[in-house]
Amino acid sequence: MKQYNVGVIGATGMVGQRFITLLENHPWFHLAAVAASARSAGKTYEEAVGNRWLMKTPMPECAKKLVVLDAAKVEEVAAKVDFVFCAVNMKKDEIKALEEAYAKAECPVVSNNSAHRFTPDVPMVVPEINADHIEIIPAQRKRLGTKRGFVAVKSNCSLQSYVPALHPLRGYGITDVLVCTYQAISGAGKTFETFPDILDNVIPYIGGEEEKSEQEPLKLWGHIEDDKIVSADAPRFTAQCLRVPVSDGHMGAVFVRFANKPSKEEILKAWKEFRGPAQDLDLPSAPKQFLHYFEENDRPQPKLDRMLENGMAVSIGRLREDNQYDYKFVCLYNKTMSGAAGGAVLLAELLAAKGYFD
């Protein structure tokens, strides 16, 4: 695989910092540019971040001396890279405009932002689940009038614990899903130092999260038709999302009903044997085993299991029959790894493997 020069837009924020750490020594991607707001532009990355480095590992040497570019100067950034990752904190309309500006400058965008998730010709991809949705990109390029440029996005972090667990079971006709998510403070871009209100507390509301948790799975399970992605009609989802005092690792408590109820053994077999396109293509960031089931009654736990397979796997446990639904179980994944930057890097690896950056 050839090496691609990569930029990170929003490089000084928490997810941007995670991108920087993941790109260190990446076999396919070389960090060539960092961009942020105008107030950071002109400083070295080390100066711009200052004492706001939030990762547990030291700032990579490859990033420290890079001069931060102004993210709004699209042509300047685009000229230095083959594609960009985008993780900015702006209004949704501003994000849409910025990402399309990069795409129209013939610089593909792999986005961690939510702004384009329901743009009909923008693929929202979890590589193990709906890798085929990247085939919409030629239609998007036609709309944008580009030859190389496009926007591709990853899904919301909340659903990346439970949708992968449900995906191998779709053959049994999932009709109804109730999910309660327990989401770490990393999902708000916070640490315990910057979010003291969460200590000894649970906040029972995360703005917009429940709607995303109910609607986005249906786009992931949709299909391409007439130059757009058409969402699936089923199953019916209902969700509640809570912020909990955990540094990293989102959990889901899932209740599921089937048209053709499988046995517990069939469910466990489906999870154990599941492989997605990311595994078949042997992408560098892909976990060898995407879904892991724990037999112990008290697993999975964020503290013990969030870094399973370098934080890119989904952990599942406590599968039981239910007296109102058919089954219930719990699941866990690492928000800042598979849920945010890591998921976007994996998507970029898929796009590279399929030739979309060439």
Model regions and ranges:
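N-terminal Rossmann-like NAD(P) cofactor-binding subdomain of oxidoreductases
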Residues: 1-204, 235-236, 308, 314-315, ...
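Charged docking surfaces used in two-component/phosphorelay signaling
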Residues: 186-358
